UniProtKB/Swiss-Prot annotation:
Keywords: FAD, Flavoprotein, Glycoprotein, Oxidoreductase, Signal. Cichorine and its derivatives are promising in the course of developing novel herbicides. It comes from Emericella nidulans (strain FGSC A4 / ATCC 38163 / CBS 112.46 / NRRL 194 / M139). GO terms for molecular function: flavin adenine dinucleotide binding; oxidoreductase activity; oxidoreductase activity, acting on CH-OH group of donors. This is Oxidoreductase cicC. The gene is cicC.
């Protein structure tokens, strides 16, 4: 899927017409103490929406972000959908530190002791400026379970749907630019039209998608009416976070920050600024944040609240260096205890994926190494309206299922019991057909370059039973935390992954797909057959789907493992909230950005109600 830089577009999204003030007026002065109504740490999936909602209602907001503009740091490798796989592989040496935190996990025992690069956006927009732009809702049953687990019905599916829709600005697909047999079906009643975040279907659907619809049907995954009404089991085209006009990435930056920059000076952004620690008065009242810009430390104080939205890794780190977390962890680094919350940094959950690759008789991202192909792709993208392969991330149709009965024979009783505890509509596997070659996922740009086009059927474990941790390596937040996802630590995840691999093969052997493959399986190849051989391959070739969450979990106040209550307020202190993926009680099936946007809208309303 390697695509070249298209430099013409690298700064287009920075154009801000009809300004009320110079753009620079929206950015803070490094080294100068300042007072605001609210200080928000992290300008990502949740932090940017919260800052927007507070600022638009007249409150002053300091938004602290360690990164800067992804348009500068990554250019079109961030903006153009087809480039979104750059720099997100497992190889720690293949990253872009201008836009990435360069997180590397501790050695993963079940992945051959590999230390894995965990791509994470260090930019305005956070990982919404780096991800694959896949957008859909979780299942109804999973959010109903969320409400049950936290003892608050306001978090169930029916009550959260309006907040998710509040964030959405859905544009129907331009079916005149898509193949006639690639028309998505969807329910307009569950898609918002007046929100900030652009969601749509890309102007190009790969020709393989229509074959995949039939292939999914052949193996028992019926086509369903979109992925946004609380149902996932089946198959459907997925929405993407794409701006419909220019077909650029839509992120929390484009949705919630760009509209305010140079227009609403209630929001002041401190970019390239690290949050060092949360400050407290009277021991437990949060009053501000000590920050650092280019080595200059200063204080941003909050009249009302401090809101941490730094993500599943940096949020627990910031809490711990500020004195909130497991007492024993803090004692190791001489950090004074503010609140003993043993759940901080615990319960890390994530999705993993891997899949076989095939040569196919169709155009895929493998053709991007052909100069003539790229030239034509650029011409189409530069047209009005933009069209062609560059408008598509390379993943546009998804499939979901519980593992079929015939593949559950090797599941242990422990695995069956754990999976049986999930809601009935919760799929155990997600299938992501990727129009290119995955290989061992160390570097997605490494392909055979043999003149053939490839298709990979990646299977993701979306019912993870393994649990990991995040810990501090120092009392300094500029030293990355210790991240231990413990992927495959629970044998059930390996058992489900084996089943997913076999089902990926079954899809490609289906009557619908058999006619488009050229030869047999290219990777890992037909020598990998037994469960033991598949497991050995999975340990080498699996990667994260980058859905880390749950490290500062929401729950009842009387539960000692709860870190926040159902309004995002940190238990044991006052004036401090968390609003990001870390407070999710568990990881729902699928891609979580929709629920994180909804979570941000929901808690922003709570903050304003308490103002």
């Amino acid at each position: 899927m390697a695509l070249r830089y298209l430099n013409k577009f690298s700064l287009l999204s920075l154009a801000v017409p009809t300004l009320a003030a110079p753009i620079g007026s929206s950015f803070g002065v490094p080294g100068t103490d300042a007072l605001y109504d609210y200080v928000v740490v992290g300008a990502g999936n949740a932090g940017a929406p919260v800052a927007y909602r507070l600022a638009e209602t007249g409150h002053t907001v300091a938004l602290v972000e360690a990164g800067s503009l992804y348009e500068y740091g990554n250019g079109n490798l961030s903006q153009i959908p087809a480039n979104s796989l750059f720099f997100i592989g497992k190889d720690p040496e293949w990253t872009n530190n201008l836009v990435d935190w360069n997180f590397v996990t501790s050695p993963q025992a079940e992945w051959n002791n590999a230390s894995v690069h965990y791509a994470s956006g260090k930019v305005l927009g956070g990982s919404t400026g780096r991800n694959l732009m896949t957008y859909h809702l979780p299942t109804k049953g999973s959010l109903d379970r969320w409400a049950e687990d936290v003892s608050d019905e306001s978090w169930n599916f029916d009550n959260m749907l309006p907040y998710i829709m509040k964030s959405q600005r859905f544009t129907p697909p331009n079916n005149n630019l898509r193949f006639r047999n690639a028309t998505p079906t969807y329910d307009p009643a569950v898609l918002g039209r007046r929100g900030r975040l652009d969601v749509t279907y890309p102007n190009y659907a790969n020709g393989l998608a229509s074959w995949l619809v039939r292939g999914f049907r052949d193996i028992g995954l019926a086509a369903i009416r979109g992925l946004n009404g609380g149902q996932l089991i089946g198959s459907a085209y997925t929405l993407s976070t794409i701006q419909p006009g220019n077909q650029h990435r839509a992120s929390s930056k484009t949705a919630y920050l760009d509209p305010l920059i140079g227009r609403n000076l209630n929001l002041i952004i401190y970019q390239s600024t690290h949050a060092k620690r949360i400050l407290f008065s009277n021991d437990t009242v949060a009053t501000g944040v000590r920050v650092s810009s280019e080595g200059q430390e200063y204080t941003l104080s909050a009249r009302n609240e401090v809101i941490v939205s730094a993500g599943a890794f940096k949020t627990p780190q910031l809490l711990m260096v500020s004195g909130i977390g497991p007492a024993a962890n803090l004692e190791r680094y001489g950090i004074p205890l503010v609140a003993d919350r043993p759940g901080v940094g615990q319960n890390l959950q994530d999705h993993t994926l891997a899949g076989p690759s095939y040569r196919v008789n169709a155009i895929t991202g493998s053709s991007n190494s052909i100069p003539e192909f790229i030239t034509e792709a650029q011409r189409q993208y530069n047209s009005n309206p933009p069209r062609g392969v560059l408008t598509n991330t390379g993943v546009d149709i998804l499939g979901w299922e519980k593992v079929p009965e015939q593949l559950r024979g090797n599941f242990s009783t422990e695995t069956e019991d754990a999976l049986a505890s999930l809601p009935e509509d919760w799929p155990e596997l997600e299938y992501l057909p990727v129009y290119g070659y995955f290989g061992d996922q160390n570097n997605y740009m490494v392909t055979p370059n043999d003149g053939f086009n490839y298709l990979t059927i990646a299977a993701a474990v979306v019912s993870p039973l393994s649990r990991g941790t995040v810990d501090i390596a120092s009392n300094d937040t500029e030293v990355n935390p210790i991240i231990d996802p413990r992927w495959f630590a629970h044998p059930g995840d390996i058992q489900v992954a084996v089943a997913g691999f076999r089902r990926s093969r079954a899809l490609m052997a289906s009557p619908a797909m058999a006619g488009i493959t050229l030869g047999g399986e290219s990777y890992p190849g037909t020598d990998v057959q037994t469960d033991d051989e598949i497991v050995e391959w999975l340990r080498e070739a699996s990667n994260t789907v980058h859905h880390a969450c749950c490290t500062a979990g929401m729950g009842p106040r009387d539960n000692p493992d709860s870190v926040v209550d159902t309004q995002g307020r940190v238990i044991g202190v006052s004036g401090l909230r968390i609003v990001d993926a870390s407070i999710m009680p568990f990881l729902p099936p699928g891609h979580p950005i929709s629920i994180i946007y909804g979570l941000a809208e929901r808690i922003a309303e709570s903050i304003l109600a308490d103002a």
